[in-house]
A protein has these predicted regions:
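Conserved acidic carboxylate
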Residues: 7-9
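Two-component/phosphorelay signaling modules centered on CheY-like receiver
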Residues: 11-30
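Negatively charged, flexible loop motifs adjacent to catalytic sites
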Residues: 13-14, 34-37, 57, 82-87
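Acidic, metal-coordinating helix/loop segments flanking the phosphotransfer/catalytic sites
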Residues: 18, 31-49
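Alpha4 helix (beta4-alpha4-beta5 surface) of REC/receiver domains from two-component response regulators
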Residues: 19, 62-63, 80-89
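Conserved phosphotransfer microenvironments
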Residues: 48-72, 84
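Proline-centered loop/turn at the N-terminus of a beta-strand
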Residues: 75-77
Length: 89
C-alpha cells in the first residue's frame, strides 16, 4: 500500500492510528498536528489515505477533509467524537 497522512493533535491517538495503518500495510504514516500544515503537505506529497482526527488546534477538521477530497485522489477518513458531531450540522 501507499503512504498515509494522519492529521491529529492527540499524541496517544496518533500512535494508535499509525500502528493500525502500519498493520494494514501503509508505509510509515506521516503525522501532522494542524490543518494548515496538512494542506501544505498534501501539495508536496501524494498520499493514498488521509485520516483527520478532529478537532485540530487551528480548526475543526472538516475543512481539511473537504480540501483533500477536492485536491487529491486520496481516500479520506474523518474521525469526530459524537458529542462534537453536532458542530457540523
Amino acid at each position: 500500500m501507499g503512504r498515509a497522512l494522519i492529521v491529529s493533535a492527540g499524541a496517544s491517538s496518533n500512535e494508535y492510528i499509525a500502528a493500525r495503518l502500519t498493520e494494514m500495510g501503509y508505509s510509515r504514516p506521516v503525522i501532522i498536528p494542524s490543518g494548515a500544515e496538512a494542506r501544505r503537505r498534501m501539495t508536496e506529497s501524494d498520499f493514498e489515505l488521509i485520516v483527520v482526527n478532529s478537532p485540530l488546534p487551528d480548526e475543526f477538521g472538516h475543512e481539511v477533509c473537504i480540501n483533500a477530497v477536492e485536491k487529491t485522489d486520496a481516500g479520506v477518513v474523518f474521525l469526530v467524537k459524537a458529542a462534537q458531531a453536532e458542530q457540523l450540522l
